[in-house]
């Protein structure tokens, strides 16, 4: 079996997979990413990282990748043109019904690999509900943008505050899908003064203020893409694929 993608397998081939085969479930989003990145940035980045990982591990029989569920819950970007979003309740219910068709079969081990920060809490609920019903299942929840090691490439400040169309994602797109980046639109970006103030209540504080993207920046960008480059994107991609490999190695032992 040289394909790693569920969609490219036959029903007989899937039936022959080991119950210990790790099922990678990609979650992304279609939402605005400012004027310099396409609306499918989250999907492109995750697909390309997974493609690279599969190429590096083509002979492995440890995992199979489900289709990327790319219509996510992106209500924080609803006021911007191009965003496609499902409300939280319907999104969780759809994902639950969709994944039951895999969980209800023989498979036991899953990696929820997510590229959209706005649905982290949704996937927490999803994993909790599935684990409650399928007690023997092992579920990893992994947000690729939170993997360790990126601080060797991107500044701590930009990693903390630049998570939507900033240096991190723009560098990845310059490496993974260079032709889709509107380079003439890349410019210095400033955040709302309320974003990182010294008060105890805030967008990123322990006591959180709920926000929509326009509360932080009218451009739709959170972060500063000005220092992005393809070399940084390559290094980030390598860290991501290496981390996925380590996750699979550890999950195999559970």
Describe each model-derived feature in a short phrase.
Residues 1-109, 117-254:
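Extended, histidine- and acidic-residue-enriched regions that form the cofactor-binding/catalytic faces
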């Amino acid at each position: 079996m040289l394909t790693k993608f569920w969609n490219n397998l036959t029903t007989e081939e899937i039936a022959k997979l080991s119950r210990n085969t790790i099922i990678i479930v990609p979650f992304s989003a279609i939402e605005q990413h400012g004027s310099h990145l396409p609306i499918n940035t989250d999907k492109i980045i995750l697909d390309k990282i997974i493609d690279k990982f599969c190429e590096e591990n083509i002979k492995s029989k440890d995992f199979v990748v489900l289709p990327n569920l790319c219509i996510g819950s992106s209500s924080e970007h609803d006021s911007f043109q191009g965003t496609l979003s499902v409300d939280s309740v319907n999104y969780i219910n759809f994902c639950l019904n969709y994944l039951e068709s895999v969980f209800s079969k023989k498979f036991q081990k899953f990696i929820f690999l997510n590229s959209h920060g706005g649905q982290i809490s949704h996937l927490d609920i999803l994993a909790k509900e599935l684990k409650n019903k399928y007690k023997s299942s092992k579920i990893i929840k992994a947000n690729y943008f939170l993997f360790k090691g990126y601080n060797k490439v991107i500044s701590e400040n930009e990693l903390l505050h630049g998570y939507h169309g900033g240096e991190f994602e723009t560098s990845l797109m310059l490496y993974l899908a260079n032709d889709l980046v509107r380079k003439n639109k890349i410019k210095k970006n400033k955040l709302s003064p309320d974003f990182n103030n010294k008060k105890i209540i805030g967008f990123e504080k322990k006591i959180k203020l709920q926000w929509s993207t326009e509360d932080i920046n009218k451009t739709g960008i959170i972060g500063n893409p000005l220092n992005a480059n393809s070399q940084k994107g390559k290094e980030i991609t390598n860290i991501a694929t290496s981390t996925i490999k380590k996750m699979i190695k550890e999950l195999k032992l559970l």
